[in-house]
């Protein structure tokens, strides 16, 4: 029997692929995402699918906003995927393909086609396979991917809570998993996004205030430098005249 990869094994692989330090503001998110992906990857009922990939890509992009340098951000995502024996290009390509197929759909069309077996394209093929799989392993990241699709199809769902909740229930029923679980995951996801945005705003405001303070101090020093220079020139002129 093969040994199951441990969290420590996965973390070791991750830090072997990405060797640079991770900004402390983002480190907790990265490590929590890594552990979440690891636990799913070793679950016997879990099977990678493009909606899950969209959830991973969306979560990473939303929570890593403002990360610098950009090259490190790319390296971190690549390492996350490689650490669980995944392919970052596949994640990005299939996430993009889902979004492209969702464009132009109405929410009614989306709900009507959900769960139909043998649909064309990556979106309907994925949804059909999930609806027909009695052992489908729902995950929070899958929920984020599904939510991303719904927001792409009907952005007004963000503002219309009743409509959003009803849509989430209908979609969950069609794909045969708990709507309560999905709702709780999405509520937490949106709440954490708000908190992260507030934190980044505070940090940016602090940095901006610090920049203004340094600029002000620099301007205050300039007259002193000019005055000192003029004083020195006057002394030199007096000495030369003597």
From Swiss-Prot:
Residues 212-242 are annotated as: Disordered. It comes from the Bacteria. Residues 178-209 form a coiled coil. Keywords: Coiled coil. One of its GO terms (cellular component) is plasma membrane-derived thylakoid photosystem II. GO terms for biological process: photosystem II assembly. InterPro entries: Thf1. Residues 217-235 have a biased composition (Basic and acidic residues). The keyword Coiled coil applies. The keyword Signal does not apply. HAMAP family: Thf1 (MF_01843). Belongs to the THF1 family. May be involved in photosynthetic membrane biogenesis. This is Protein Thf1. It comes from Crocosphaera subtropica (strain ATCC 51142 / BH68). The gene is thf1.
């Amino acid at each position: 029997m093969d040994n199951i990869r441990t969290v420590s094994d996965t973390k070791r692989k991750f830090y072997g692929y990405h060797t640079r330090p991770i900004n402390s503001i983002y480190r907790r998110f990265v490590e929590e995402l890594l552990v979440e992906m690891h636990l799913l990857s070793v679950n016997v009922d879990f099977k990678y699918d493009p909606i899950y990939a969209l959830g991973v890509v969306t979560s990473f992009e939303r929570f890593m906003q403002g990360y610098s340098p950009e090259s490190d951000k790319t390296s971190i995502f690549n390492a996350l995927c490689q650490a669980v024996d995944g392919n970052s290009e596949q994640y990005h390509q299939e996430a993009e393909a889902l979004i492209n197929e969702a464009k132009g759909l109405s929410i009614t069309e989306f709900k009507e086609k959900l769960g139909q077996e043998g649909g064309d394209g990556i979106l309907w093929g994925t949804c059909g396979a999930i609806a027909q799989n009695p052992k489908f392993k729902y995950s929070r990241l899958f929920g984020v991917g599904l939510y991303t699709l719904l927001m792409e199809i009907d952005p007004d769902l963000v503002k219309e809570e009743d409509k959003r909740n009803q849509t989430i229930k209908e979609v969950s029923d069609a794909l045969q998993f708990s709507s309560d679980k999905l709702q709780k995951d999405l509520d937490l996801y949106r709440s954490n996004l708000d908190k992260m945005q507030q934190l980044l705003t505070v940090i940016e405001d602090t940095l901006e205030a610090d920049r203004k303070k340094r600029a002000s101090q620099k301007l205050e020093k300039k007259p002193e430098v000019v005055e000192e220079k003029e004083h020195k020139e006057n002394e030199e002129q007096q000495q030369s005249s003597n």
